[in-house]
Amino acid sequence: RVPGLEIQALYGYRACNIFSFKGMKEIKRFNPEVIHVQTEFGIGIFGRIAAEYLDIPVVYTYHTMWTDYSHYINPINSETVDTVVKKVITKISKFYGNSCQGLIVPSNKTKDALIHYGLKQKNIYTIPTGLELERFSVKNKNNELCQSLIEKYHLQNHFVLTFLGRIAPEKSITVIIDALKKV
């Protein structure tokens, strides 16, 4: 494990140095066939340095559409700053994607966005993460359970909307709420 500093403001993200002699020594001793990086920062940079130095292929999982998070580094909410930040993010994403031997993305939407950014990567693999949507299909609805919850919480005459996820601006929860006002 590479030492890091927890950043509470970023949901407990741990920032670490981009290089560790001890970590490099351990990777060299372990002699992996592939290095899998799952972040563009800190430990991800270290993984890429180790892969380059030890001539090991890199597989990179692109988890986050960073352009959706530009507001976190644009506290003045400037359109110009946002445009510049998004261009930088696109360039970084393109560089990282083009410099690995395999790229894993969570959706075809992400894959299409990265190709739009200019990735030349031929080894892009879509591996969905997150919810098993079929579990929430209407065909799997448990009417007895639904009815018991409606009765338990006295919801017979109420419209109920459920959101499962982290509450953050990029989730656009207010868009749903505003749209429901118009229905």
Specify the residue positions occupied by each region the protein language model found.
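Carbohydrate-associated surface elements
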Residues: 109, 130
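Conserved donor-binding/catalytic core segment of Leloir-type glycosyltransferases
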Residues: 144, 154-171, 177-180
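An amphipathic, basic-hydrophobic alpha-helix
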Residues: 4-35, 39-49, 53, 87, ...
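Membrane-proximal helix-turn-helix segments that form the acceptor-binding/catalytic region
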Residues: 53, 83-102
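Acceptor-binding helix/loop patch of EC 2.4 sugar-transfer enzymes
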Residues: 4-9, 61-91, 134-138
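Short beta-strand scaffold positions
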Residues: 37, 104-105
